[in-house]
Each structure stands twice: as C-alpha cells, then as structure tokens.
Amino acid sequence: MASTIMSQEVSWTDILEKHPALRWIKPIPEDWEIFPKHLCAFESFLYVAVGQEVRSLDCRLLKHKNEASHKNFYKKLFNPELDFMIEQICLSKNGRFLAVVGKSKIVILGLRSKLSEQNPLAESVSNFGESVNNFSNSEHQENGTNSLKLSEVTICSVAVINPSSQIVSVRFHPLGKSGRSLVVLTETSLLLYEAGNGVLMPDYEIPLKLTHQASNSFDADVDLHIPTAFCFSNVSQGWGVFTIYILTRGGDVFSVCPVMPANAMIPQDVLKQIRLILTKKEDDADAENHRRNVHWITKLLGEAALANDLSTSFVISEGSSELFDSSDYVSVRRPDDFSFIPSMQGPFLLQPAVADDELIEDYCDIYSFGMNPIDVLAIGGSEGRLDLLLLVSEVSGRWSKLNDHGLASMKLIVSQVHSLYLSNNNPYMVLQPDIQSPYSLIAYHANGLHVVDIESWARDLNLNFENSEFLNNEEENDEDELSNVLVSIPSRTSVLERLDTNPLNESTDAVVGCAQLYYPSLGKILISLTRNWQTTVFDDSDLATMGVNKESLSNEMDYSKSLGTSSLEQVDDLDEKLTYTPLYVSLLEKTPFTDPSIPSLVERTIVPAELQNEITVSSASLRFLGKVVARYRETLNLLDHGCSELHHRLKLQREEYERQQNHIYKLSDRISNFREKAWSTEHLEHLTSDMSMCEKRIDQVLQRVMDLRVPDLSDKEKQFIKEIGNYKEKVTGERGIEKRVETLKTLLQRTKPRDAQTTLVASSSDMRLAAIEQLQKLLAQQSLSIKELKTKTVSFQRLLQTS
C-alpha cells in the first residue's frame, strides 16, 4: 500500500519531469536524426510525439489526484494511419485538431472538446462530430509497483494528406473557422487544406518562386533558395492578418498576401481598416494590382454584409463552451478568383547590407512579433544566431496570373537592428511565442533554451512611428529621438538562458520540444523535452524573474548613488542645531542581497547520461564536475560576502539601539529629577525659551525644505507641513500651551508666602500644590508634543535622504 500512495510533499512539477508519458524504453541510436517540435500543449493537456505514436497527458491529474495510478496515467492516441516516424506535431488554436507530420504524410486527428462533453448543441456546430467524438478505451495496463496505467484510445483520423513534395513546416491558420484550416509549406509550394474526412486535396495552392532566374537556367545558389520555415504575421491591422512570411535557407525573407482560409472568422475592426484601402490612391504602375485588391476587398465586404444579415447576435464558439458576441467577428468565405492567385513578394532587401563574413548559410525559423505600426521580425540560424529585423516597407496584397508564377517587382526593405549569439554548433533553432508577453519569444535549439524580450525598446519605437506629425516632420529633434531608440536596442534587449543542455560543448542531448501550459489551477508552466527524454519544468516562480540588462542596472545604481550623496551633503550643510542624532544610517543602506550579481534563479542544467547511472571517472565527467563546482563556488563566495555585509549592518543597528536605550535612560533620570525638584518661575521661563528655540528650528527646517522641494512637494510632505502647523497652533495659539503657562506663572506669583493668617497660608499652599500638579501635566503634554514633533522631523529628514 505504501507504494501506491504518492507523497503529498512531492511537487506535481517534479512528478511531471519523471512521468512515463515523456519516456521511451527503446535505446536511441547515435545516428538518429534530430527532429524538433515534438511537444505541444493546450490548456492543461500535453501532447508528445514518441517514435510512431502520440501520447496525451492531463496535468490536472498530477496536481489534484493523490493516488499513484492517477499520477502515472496517460493516453496513447492510436490510429492505423500513424505508420511513420513522426517529425513534428502541431495543435490547432482551439485545441480540437492535432496535425501529426511525417516526412511526406500528414494525419489530422480529431480530439475530444469540452463543448462536446458539456453542451449537446456541439453536435450541430460540428459537421463531423461523430468522427471527432468516437473514442473507445481499448485496454488498461498496470506495470508492477509503479502503478503505470496506460489507456490506448482509438482516434478517428479526420484527414490524411499526402503532398507531392517533401514537407517543410505545418501550422494551423489563426483565422480558420473551427480551427480546421491547415497551411502546409513544402519545398515547391504553399498549400491550404480544410480538414474533412478521407484523403484531402489542397483547397488552395500557391507555387513558390524564390529566385528571379528562369527555371531552365543554372543557379549556383540553388541550395540557398530552399524554404525552411514560415510564420503568420501577428499584426492585427490591415493586410497584416492575411500575410505569411517565408524564410529560405540563405536568410531571404519573402511574403505572400493575401492568404485566407476558405472559411474564416475575421474581426470587425479588420474589415473597417480594409475599407480604407478602397479610398487609397495607387501609382499608375500599380493600377492593375490596385484594381485586383479593390475587387477582392469588395467581395470580402459583400460576404461580411451577407453574414451580418443572416447571423444571430450571440453564437457558441466551436471547440469552447463559452458564448461570444458575433458582432465582434464575421464568418466569411474566401473570395476566390480562378484567374489570379496571390504572388510571392521579395526577397526583402536588407538595409544596411551586412558584410559577407557575417552571413550564415543555414537559417531555420522565423517569427513575427506583431508590433503596430512597424513590425519586428526574428529569424534564427543554425549557428545559434538570432537576428532582429524591422519591417520598414508596408506589405499589401499582390496578385499574379494563374500561369505566371514570377516574383512581384515591388521593392521591400527590412533593417537588421541587432544580432544575438545564443549558442554555437547548432543544427537547428525553433522560435515560438511566449504566453507571458507579446513582446517576448522562446528560442530553443540543440544546446538549450532562451527567452528574448524586446518590450523596453519596442514600445518607444512604436510611439515614435505612431505620431503622424513625426512622419511628416524633418526636424533633427525627432530624428535624434528615433536614432537614440535604435542605438539603444542592443543594450535594452533582454536575453535569459532558461536551460543549458550542453555544458561541455560535447553533448548530443538536444532540446526537441518546448510547450507552455496556461490553466487557472496550474498556472503558467514552461516544459522542455530533450533527445534523451530529459524533461525540465519551469513553474510560475521560475518564470516570474526575468533577466535584467547589466548596463541599465549599472546606470540606475550610479544614479541612485548620486542622489544619495547629494542628499547627504545637503543634510551636512545644515546647521548643527538642526541635525537630530542619532540617524539610522544602517537602515538607509541597501541590503547586500539585492546585488544583481547574486543569482536569484535556480540554475537548471542537464546532467550527462554517464553520471545518471554508475559513476565512471572520465575526462568529460571531470570537466563537467569542475565547471559545476566552479559555478557554485562563485555563488558561495557571493553569499559569504553578502552574509559578512549583513553582519556588519546588524552590528551597526545594535550600536544604534544601545545608544537609543542609553538616551532613554538619561531622559528618564531627568524626568525623575524634575519631579523631585521644586518648580520656580525661572525654570518656567527657561522652558519657554527652549520652546521658542524649538519653534525657530522647525521654521528653519521648513524654510530649507521649501527651498529644496517646492514646487515638487509630494502629498506626504504637504501633510507633514500641515501637521507641523497644527502643532505650532497648539503651542502658540490663543488656547495654546504658552497662554496656559502665563496663567500658571501669574497664579504662582500670587501664591508666594507672606505674613498672613494660618488659614490663608493653608489655602495658598493648597492652591500651590494644585498649580504644580496642573503644571506637571502641562509639561508632560508639552514634552510629548515636542517628542512627536522631533520624530516627525527625523522621519521627514530621512525621507529627503532616500528620495
């Protein structure tokens, strides 16, 4: 029984790292080709490709179920069409369809949706709901004491695709209705498919023309013109939602626009922006293309108007159990024209041009950040290099005749603004979006995983371009502002290394998959999978801390130091009478553990396979252990230095507390002496003079504060000045302490001993005792007010030092 119950102290992320669904029993040969994109996720479900099978895992069972049988449970998605080695898998946006990709075959599987389980109306939404929801549990297996439960689930294949050329990349179109529009990039063409039952033929085909040379001519750079990846433009305005960027091995970027699924869901805002294109005037050279764009847009708007008349106000989103307002989206069909097809545009000219020695010959992936109004593209190379490009030219719809597959003559320009060298000796690099921020992307390659963030400079760059006056203004100030943003891009681009799988530069354990889970009960999870089936999980605590640029940190520290020294110098320039001691200097100092050199992240490394089983002494093991020991030795040295600094800080605090305690003892002695001594008018006059001196000090401090801070006084400072005025009114007002002291003085003068009757002497002594008691209360109240006033002044002075 003890082996069947999972310990509650083990985190569910640790269980996920050792889950049997992410393991393969068969040994991996050394010459096995590396195929990335073996991992994808939707909400709490994780899908992984293992050999010729696809496994599904619900991460909610790992966190909310206590039995070991639930902890080790996963499903194997079985289909007779999966008879090939899987190279990549791709999931639709709504999580209903999974594309399993081989070298020359694609199988689209229909997955069970939450809507089909909860809402009976789902059957009317889907045209092939029976095939999608036809699940049958065929067997359950238990493996010894580990309680391994495997449920083999038969999935009816929605579609089978057999392209005529080798498959390069596969993605589901984000505008596709029901998520069944698949875009396939092969070595010769760009294909669009609408998922249905049986073997599919392409719904739309755009031949690739990646060079200006004739097809029958000799091309020395034919290997560089092979497509390697494509991505959708994430720009949500104008033509951007219909644009696809294609990357070649030589680093050339091409665009195809417009590319639209046969059945699409388009936002109303996009249609409003496209209407503006109808009023835009074009040059005479582009008159024919402008007429084609107007014809295509007019058909699209007609389909949208007809759909608005026939649709209801609220519909159920297919693949989800939520209602959404149909006034925000329009379901339209693609306006096909059988005599014209979208034309290839490019290649984009790189301005300014880079040197020949900086060029690499094998680019792998491309990604669009979707910035408005100027987009930022990222392209990754096999040598671990990541280039950031600004899309200077505006991409619009371009058309060509059906028999003419030439390139568009329009010159498009991109500008390379920064290059990052993430690693070396990489056969590939994969770029994918980050759920944490639209300004960041995840780049994983054979040697690890990095997160690149451009938010700090992308916002400033877009603000410059959004200003319409700036676009028509040639003043130097605006140009200088833009140039300052462009120059600061290298220093303001944040790069964080999440995983290092090659610490010795000799390992072959490459990252073959990366996925992100985002579910309310699970949080945000980043998962990576390596070739040797090593799984690494980063939860919210790991993802919360982002790398900070060292240069910006040093500038901020220098600025804070300059502010601190200037404020201390201003305090030292004050009169000695105005300084209140002791000051808590140690509390104003920065804690040593906020030093950015002390790492706050848990460093994750992949241990070599020879160290996981029986430890054998070899040169590689010794180098690895030496590197790990050196890293932790540096960290321990930093922590030791921080502990010594903290010990010194605590020592200063102890001395200050002891000094304050001695000061309190002295004050208590003085109070006891005051109580024992007889009160006289001279002593009251002395107290009155001290009170006036205190008022003068307060006035001087206020005057200096007003000179330094006006007109930039904060709300707390204004409130503090108001409180000081109230204290002054209590002391010097009509009903203040001074008036009451004057009355007591006259009362004491009247009660001096003189030759009188015993009854009068007795009455005068009683009056004297009553006056003394009242005076003691008044002095106690006065000392309390002065003490509060001193405390306020010290806190305000400390606030000035820290600001």
Curated annotation (Swiss-Prot):
InterPro entries with a match to the protein in the record: Nucleoporin_Nup88 (IPR019321), NUP88/NUP82 (IPR037700)
GO cellular component: nuclear envelope; nuclear membrane; nuclear pore; nuclear pore cytoplasmic filaments; nuclear pore linkers
Signal sequence range: none
GO molecular function (one): structural constituent of nuclear pore
GO biological process, one term: protein import into nucleus
Keywords: Membrane, mRNA transport, Nuclear pore complex, Nucleus, Protein transport, Translocation, Transport
Membrane topology: Peripheral membrane protein
Subcellular location: Nucleus, Nuclear pore complex; Nucleus membrane
Pfam families: Nup88
Cross-referenced PANTHER family: NUCLEAR PORE COMPLEX PROTEIN NUP88, NUCLEOPORIN NUP84-RELATED
Job description of the protein: Functions as a component of the nuclear pore complex (NPC). NPC components, collectively referred to as nucleoporins (NUPs), can play the role of both NPC structural components and of docking or interaction partners for transiently associated nuclear transport factors.
Binding partners and assembly: Component of the nuclear pore complex (NPC). NPC constitutes the exclusive means of nucleocytoplasmic transport. NPCs allow the passive diffusion of ions and small molecules and the active, nuclear transport receptor-mediated bidirectional transport of macromolecules such as proteins, RNAs, ribonucleoparticles (RNPs), and ribosomal subunits across the nuclear envelope.
The protein's name: Nucleoporin nup82
Organism name: Schizosaccharomyces pombe (strain 972 / ATCC 24843) (Fission yeast)
